[in-house]
Amino acid sequence: MSINAPKFKFLGLTAIALIAGLLYTQIDYGQDAMQSTKITEPVIENKDNTNPAGYEKVTLPLSDVENIDGQIEDYLLDMWPIMSEQEVQAIIGSKDISKKLVNDTLGHVEFSLTINVPSHYLDPAPKMLWELNIPEFTSRIYQIYNNDTILITVWPNVVGAPGTKTYTGLYNIFKLRNWPTWKDPESDPLEPGTPPGPGNPLGLFAAHYDENSLRYFHGTNKNGLLKNEYRALSHGCVRNDNGNIDKMKRFIVKRMITSQDISWWANSKKSMVYNFTEEEKENFPVRIKYKTFDIGSDSYGDYIIFFKDVYGYARGNKWSKFDREELMTFSTVENITAEYKAIHKPNQFQLPDDKLIPIVESLISDHKDYEKYYFADLVAGTQSETGK
């Protein structure tokens, strides 16, 4: 026994050292894995890289492997709250999950999750454009990135009624109000205003853009009005669905405010005001236009849609001194054909004037507002009528 004791002692020490080494290795891998989840690795186009240009590969931590899509969605909407559902699903579709056996003896496995994210979403100081078309009652939110204008999301609005118009113009977001109070400007000055909360006409958040008039973007206490086809109903401000204005609030306080950290506003119900710095103003321009038609394309093809001339400007009604005439475009043959040709270049499918102009003239005289008319159907109808 005494002869073999050192041997067993040696083996015991060796086993302890081996286990300690394995534990150390496991911890070391774990630390590396934690660090790797905080890094975004730029995608470089080469023959060995299948990622498309303009994307970055982002590595995310995996809290569990049961709800991976939900974890990706939470990450994306925390990073970019106004990201569209379509974009979220497209990024989720790029996910790549791999596993690595860290330790054979203990069977420890690490999972790695990567997604391909369009590079513009990772811009640390994004520049945005909020565009509203009054007769369409619709906002389009764009990001200005590398001299390109990228559509981020689209949502409905309520705009000023004909007696209390929303003005056209070029502006910048300059002030935020969280849980604002509201007082009817036409009410008795001695009457108290409406306190903050769900019953407030401004909703839960307001973003001011016009320093010359009491007009701004805000939420609403009448979300149902946003489902109406005709939505020129406000006192001049631009109402937004409460869900959409909350997304915008979260985006602004997390991504647009760079002079200080007010990200904690995202979940706050306190009444607060923040004034933009000059640089922050420049990074969030606003364009409000008055255009009574649009030419677009969807899965069914190219179309034209007309919008009601809600303020009668196309019929000669006078606009305000605050309005900008250059931001008004009416449904004339000249305007429609010019936009059609700008979109459909000569080397693409383009209707010749002898087909396009009669179609446009007919539509101007007889159409239903807010209904899409597809050019392929219009051409087929014209050919049927003429026997061609």
Q: What role is predicted for each listed range?
A:
Residues 2-14:
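N-terminal Sec-pathway targeting helices
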Residues 19-238, 242-388:
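N-terminal pre-domains immediately preceding structured catalytic cores
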